[in-house]
Amino acid sequence: MSTIEERVKKIVAEQLGVKEDEVTNEKSFVDDLGADSLDTVELVMALEEEFETEIPDEEAEKITTVQAAIDYVNSHQG
């Protein structure tokens, strides 16, 4: 099974239409990977589905980088 980091990066690449090797931990979804507000909503929804969790809106607003997404999932698993 893939690590959480690998799974998050795969989802980000698929949702934003970028290559997986462009998705590094420090990248901002908006500033570096070209996401708009709709992309970020869809990204959060994809993360919720993949990791079978619910991300409240106030938390979703804080998930602006690849690392923030990884950290959120890590802290809300199991």
Curated annotation (Swiss-Prot):
Modified sites of kind O-(pantetheine 4'-phosphoryl)serine: 37
Pathway: Lipid metabolism; fatty acid biosynthesis
One MF annotation (Gene Ontology) recorded for this entry: acyl carrier activity
Keyword Hydrolase: no
Cell location: Cytoplasm
GO biological process: lipid A biosynthetic process
Keyword terms of this UniProt record: Cytoplasm, Fatty acid biosynthesis, Fatty acid metabolism, Lipid biosynthesis, Lipid metabolism, Phosphopantetheine, Phosphoprotein
InterPro entries for the chain: ACP, ACP-like_sf, PP-bd_ACP, Ppantetheine_attach_site
Free-text description of this protein's post-translational modifications in UniProt: 4'-phosphopantetheine is transferred from CoA to a specific serine of apo-ACP by AcpS. This modification is essential for activity because fatty acids are bound in thioester linkage to the sulfhydryl of the prosthetic group.
GO-annotated cellular components: cytosol; membrane
Gene3D superfamilies attached to this UniProt entry: ACP-like
Domain Carrier: 2-77
UniProt xrefs under PANTHER family: ACYL CARRIER PROTEIN (PTHR20863), CARRIER DOMAIN-CONTAINING PROTEIN (PTHR20863:SF76)
Function text: Carrier of the growing fatty acid chain in fatty acid biosynthesis.
Similarity comment text for this entry: Belongs to the acyl carrier protein (ACP) family.
Protein name, per record: Acyl carrier protein
Species, as recorded: Pseudomonas putida (strain W619)
